Amino acid sequence: MKRRQRLTARSRLRAGIRCHNRFYNAMVQDLASAKRNGVYGERLAPLFSELVPAETLKTALGVSLAFEVNLGQRRPDCVCTVQFGKGSDAKGVCILIELKTCRFSKNMNTASKNLQRKGGMRQLHDSCRLLARTLPPGSGEIVLAPVLVFVAQRGMRVLRVTRLSPQVVYSNAAVLSCTISRLAEYAPPVSAKSTRRRCVAKGTKAKAFSTKAAAEPVPSITPAQPSAAAAVVSLFPAAVPANTTNAAAVHQPVAVSHVNPLAWAASLFSPK
């Protein structure tokens, strides 16, 4: 009996991890499409529409996604930063997302889901506090928006979105994006669809061949040592009101290295 319970717990954990990874990859594709077309898809609309309208996202200077961001005591599943201008005084939005996966979606008020919700809210509160302590210097107004998302393991449908009250901090949006990307420990794998390549050899006819991405997820990348940053006074009180929506209905400069394995995340959606 105990062995069976252990196996069940392990299988549930593996299923949750697989769902997280699939959702990460879907977010990259969906957000790229929204940035390009100015329209949110069904999956992103309940997450982003109230924070950054799609048309505003389309005209943003840059949008970045980072996954499994190592903040020390906490590691938010996803952090999305949106930059609306150039310079250290540019405004921006930083959305911290915590994912909770569900095997069954008919009843969202079960005891286990309520425990997931309480744990997720606590994780988001801690993540915001830790991020505020390591903000890069800058005078730009940045909105920190924590969001808890329940996702169905089948179909990756967004079932419920719970938002903590946004907090306003001051930082450099561009450097913040790079800093967060540098702390990311996961990169979504390349699409499993076959990609066509052209092999050209001198004196021979070019031959097309296809390669498939590895099925195994990308291994964790060890983050660089956190850069020294001035401490920021905590802006997050212990009790923060939440908004729940059912998806169905003066600082010294800090140098940040741009040469890292996840540099693509900071410029993935930047205008060409």
From Swiss-Prot:
Family annotation (InterPro entries): Herpes_UL24 (IPR002580)
UniProt keyword annotations, A-Z: Host cytoplasm, Host Golgi apparatus, Host nucleus, Late protein, Virion
Record-stated family: Belongs to the herpesviridae UL24 family.
GO annotations of cellular component type: host cell Golgi apparatus; host cell nucleolus; virion component
Keyword presence, tRNA processing: no
Subcellular location field: Virion; Host cytoplasm; Host nucleus, Host nucleolus; Host Golgi apparatus
Protein's job: May participate in nuclear egress of viral particles. Plays a role in the dispersal of several host nucleolar proteins including NCL/nucleolin and NPM1. Since deletion of host NCL/nucleolin negatively impact on nuclear egress, UL24 supposedly acts on this process through its effect on host nucleoli.
Domain of life the protein comes from: Viruses
Gene name of this polypeptide: UL24
Coiled coil residues, start to end: none
Name listed for the protein in its UniProt record: Protein UL24 homolog
Expression induction: Expressed late in the infection cycle.
Record organism: Equine herpesvirus 1 (strain Ab4p) (EHV-1)
